[in-house]
Design a protein with these regions (language model features):
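ABC transporter nucleotide-binding domains
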Residues: 10-15, 20-216, 220-222
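Alpha-helix N-cap/helix-start and coil->helix boundary motif
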Residues: 19, 103-106, 202, 227, ...
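C-terminal coupling/interaction segments
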Residues: 2-3, 279-317
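Pre-NBD coupling/linker segments of ABC/ABC-like ATPases
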Residues: 1-9
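A short linear hydrophobic-aromatic micro-motif
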Residues: 132, 262-266, 297-302
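ABC transporter nucleotide-binding domain
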Residues: 181-278
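A generic structural signal for secondary-structure junctions
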Residues: 88, 114, 213, 231-234, ...
Length: 317
């Protein structure tokens, strides 16, 4: 891999023309992707869109039909055990030895890596504290809730201090409390580890990810920063909530606004007005003076932004 350009973040994950076909069926169409180091990257798609296939190819757990992938500068699409030192992986349905305690399980995993006993003990303590399981270190894993098991799964994936962490649908089977705890944990890793998070749950991606890729039927539709994505698909709609004491004055205001050349449409429901504008600069300059001119008191003035769900539904039609 070449050196990153000055002023850009180094790439933690990269792939070129990565694909997977089963006969004529494309599980993943040729994919070119770059994920900056230290970011939380959200890989969003419906069930069956190709998210798990992509992760398996990026981690070397499946062989691609074509293309190559690198994690932390080491190619993963060749049979090279060095690459597995560079990432941690939590599959969608992780398996545990239910008769073990979390300490026993993490020690079992840590023995796969070059750590002596003292190093393993220290790292296990660090991981249990990080994922909030220190108080449960003597309990059997079989008695853990789903959220506790997923947090233990992240601990085992990070036990060897990898620079990259792959999480495949980590919250899909959790209740709301478990999801909240796990998302807080994932968010806390930002800047320390590069996280590649696949999910079909839009709220989770929107909450913790700073960069988002959307995949549909094995094809990557786009990659963008979360805020950039929301801005790119923004609708030019202003919501005005007028004080109810001013309702008798509202009709005259609405009638005048409808005549403005920058107005594409207007709806009014009780004391809330939504104005669809064609020229945002003109609207910003003119609306507030019009409110003052008509003696209206304003409770709320808001440029509406689409939700990630609305963007996703638009793109995945």
């Amino acid at each position: 891999m070449g050196s990153p350009a000055a002023g850009t973040k180094p790439e933690a994950i990269r792939c070129q023309h990565l694909s997977k076909y089963y006969g004529d069926v494309a599980a993943l169409k040729p994919l070119d992707l770059s994920v900056p180091a230290g970011s939380v990257f959200g890989f969003l798609g419906r069930n069956g869109a190709g998210k798990t296939t992509t992760i398996r190819l990026l981690t070397g757990l499946a062989r691609p039909t074509s293309g190559s992938a690198w994690v932390d500068g080491v190619e993963t699409t060749r049979a090279d055990s060095r690459a597995r030192q560079n990432f941690g992986y939590l599959p969608q349905d992780p398996a545990f030895y239910n008769w073990m305690t979390p300490v026993e399980f993490l020690d079992y995993i840590a023995r796969l890596f070059p750590m002596n006993r003292a190093q393993r003990r220290q790292r296990i303590e660090e991981m249990l504290s990080l994922v909030g399981l220190k108080d449960a270190e003597t309990r059997r894993i079989g008695g853990f809730s789903g959220g506790m098991q997923q947090r233990l799964g992240i601990a085992q994936a990070l036990i060897h201090r990898p620079p990259v962490l792959f999480l495949d649908e980590p919250t899909s089977s959790l209740d709301p409390a478990g999801r909240y705890e796990l998302l807080d944990l994932i968010s806390s890793l930002r800047g320390q580890v590069t996280v590649f998070l696949s999910s079909h749950i839009l709220a989770d991606i929107e909450r913790v990810c700073d960069t988002i890729g959307i995949i549909r039927e094995g094809e990557l539709l786009l990659v963008a920063g979360r805020d950039e994505l929301l801005s790119r698909y923004a609708t030019n709609v202003i919501a005005l909530e007028i004080d109810r004491d001013c309702l008798p004055l509202l009709n005259a205001f609405v009638a005048q606004v409808e005549t403005q050349p920058w107005v594409a449409g207007l709806t009014a429901a009780n004391n809330v007005i939504r104005v669809n504008v064609t020229d945002t600069a003109a609207a910003r300059q003119a609306l507030l003076p019009l409110l003052v001119q008509h003696g209206l008191l304003l409770n709320r003035y808001e440029w509406l932004r689409p939700t990630l769900e609305e963007i996703f539904l638009t793109l995945s039609q």
